[in-house]
Amino acid sequence: MIKREDVYKIGLFNKPHGIHGELSFTFTDDIFDRADCDYLICRLDDIFVPFFIEEYRFRSDSTALVKLEGVDTAERARMFTNVEVYFPVKHAEEAGPGELSWDFFVGFRVEDVRHGALGKVTDVDTSTVNTLFVVDRDGDELLIPAQEELIAGIDQKHKIITVDLPEGLLSLDECDDEES
C-alpha cells in the first residue's frame, strides 16, 4: 500500500482530451519527465493508486496530455476528472536536489542551527518573488524564506531542512502575535 509520506503532489488531471483516453494534466512539477519512473500515482477515494504512463506530450510549461495504460476511451478517462496526481518520493530523490520542485519539501521538518526544531512544512508560498516555507509550529504558522543562503542542509532521507536563520527573524513572528 502506498502511503502519503511516500509521494508528493505534482498536479491534477483536468478532463479527457479526445476519444482515445488521453487526459489533460496540469502540473506544478515536471519531475515525471526528468526522473526515471514510468508511472504516476492518482488519489482515488483517498487511496493512492499507481498507473503506468503509456505516453505523454507537453502542451505548455504547465500542461500535458497524458495517456495511461488501460485507459482507452473518453468514458474511462472521465473517471480521472479532477483527480490529484502524485509522484513517488524515491524516484524524485534520484533527480537530485537541484532538480526538485518546491512542492517536494512539503512534509519536511525544519530545524534551525541555534533554535532547534521549528516545525513541519505544510505548504510553500511561491506567490511572490521571495519563496516562503509555510511551517506549522505548534498550531501557529511560521513563514521562513526559502533562500539558498539560509539553508544549511537538506537531509532527504530523514526529510529535514536545516536552516541558519538570522538573529531576530523568529522573534519578528512573536512581535506580530503581541500586536494582535
UniProtKB/Swiss-Prot annotation:
Q: Superkingdom of this entry's organism?
A: Bacteria
Q: Provide a GO CC annotation, any one.
A: ribosome
Q: A biological process (GO) annotation for this entry?
A: rRNA processing
Any one Pfam family match given in the protein's UniProt record, by short name = PRC_RimM
Q: Does the keyword Cytoplasm apply?
A: yes
Q: Which Gene3D superfamilies match?
A: PRC-barrel domain, RimM
Q: Which residues form the PRC barrel domain?
A: 97-169
Q: Does the keyword Chaperone apply?
A: yes
Q: Name one GO molecular function term.
A: ribosome binding
Q: Where in the cell is it found?
A: Cytoplasm
For this UniProt record, the keywords arranged alphabetically read as follows: Chaperone, Cytoplasm, Ribosome biogenesis, rRNA processing
Summary of the function given for this chain in its UniProt record:
An accessory protein needed during the final step in the assembly of 30S ribosomal subunit, possibly for assembly of the head region. Essential for efficient processing of 16S rRNA. May be needed both before and after RbfA during the maturation of 16S rRNA. It has affinity for free ribosomal 30S subunits but not for 70S ribosomes.
**Free-text comment about domains:** The PRC barrel domain binds ribosomal protein uS19.
List the HAMAP family.
Ribosome_mat_RimM
| NCBIfam families for this protein | 16S_RimM
Assembly and interaction partners: Binds ribosomal protein uS19.
Q: Which family does it belong to?
A: Belongs to the RimM family.
Q: Which PANTHER family match?
A: RIBOSOME MATURATION FACTOR RIMM (PTHR33692:SF1)
Record-given protein name:
Ribosome maturation factor RimM
- What organism does the record attribute this protein to? Bacteroides fragilis (strain ATCC 25285 / DSM 2151 / CCUG 4856 / JCM 11019 / LMG 10263 / NCTC 9343 / Onslow / VPI 2553 / EN-2)
Classification lineage: Bacteria, Pseudomonadati, Bacteroidota, Bacteroidia, Bacteroidales
